[in-house]
Regions:
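Basic/polar N-terminal segments that are highly enriched at the extreme N-terminus
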Residues: 1-8, 133
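Residue-level recognition of well-ordered beta-strand positions that form the cores
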Residues: 89-93, 108
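A solvent-exposed, acidic/Ser-Thr-rich amphipathic alpha-helical stretch
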Residues: 7, 13, 26-84, 93, ...
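Short beta-strand edge/turn micro-motifs at domain boundaries
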Residues: 102-130
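A short, structured loop/turn motif at beta-sheet edges
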Residues: 78-86, 109-115
Length: 133
C-alpha cells in the first residue's frame, strides 16, 4: 500500500471514530484504538486500560441522548514513519451543553493485520476562547 493510501485509510479511521462519537456510539468510537494495549496521555496522567477508558467515556459523556456533544477533528496532519507506523496530529473541538473542549491530539497509529489503530493517544486541551461556542 502506498503512503497516500495508508494516509487515506488512517483518515477513514478518524472519520469513523468522529461519526461514532457524534451518534453516541462509544464502542464504535473506541474501535479506532488498539485493544487492549492503547496508551492514553491526558491531564498529566498515563492510562493503559482500553476498557477503563470506554467506561470513562460512557460515565462522563453518556447519559441523555446527545449529551456526548458534537466532536470534530480538523487540520489532520499525517506523517508516515514506517510501513506499519504513522504520526497523526490534529485539532479537535467538542461542543456540548456541559462545556466545550478544544485542543490538539497527537497520535501514534499502528497497522495490524492490514488495519490502522491508535496505539498512543495524547490530548492537550486548551482554553476555549471562541465566544460563539
Amino acid at each position: 500500500m502506498s503512503d497516500v493510501m495508508d494516509a487515506d485509510a488512517i483518515r477513514a479511521v478518524i472519520g469513523a471514530m468522529q461519526a461514532a462519537w457524534n451518534r453516541g456510539d462509544f464502542h464504535g468510537y473506541m474501535a479506532g484504538f488498539a485493544n487492549p494495549d492503547v496508551v492514553f496521555v491526558s491531564r498529566g496522567r498515563i492510562q493503559k486500560d482500553w476498557q477503563a477508558t470506554l467506561d470513562h467515556y460512557i460515565a462522563d459523556y453518556g447519559g441523555a441522548p446527545g449529551s456526548q456533544g458534537e466532536l470534530a477533528f480538523t487540520n489532520i496532519r499525517i506523517e508516515m514513519l514506517a510501513p506499519d507506523a504513522a504520526q497523526l496530529i490534529s485539532d479537535y473541538r467538542l461542543v456540548r451543553a456541559a462545556g466545550n473542549q478544544v485542543g490538539v491530539n497527537t497520535r501514534l497509529m499502528r497497522k495490524r493485520d492490514g488495519k490502522w489503530f491508535i496505539a498512543l493517544n495524547h490530548v492537550s486541551q486548551i482554553e476555549d476562547r471562541d465566544p460563539r461556542s
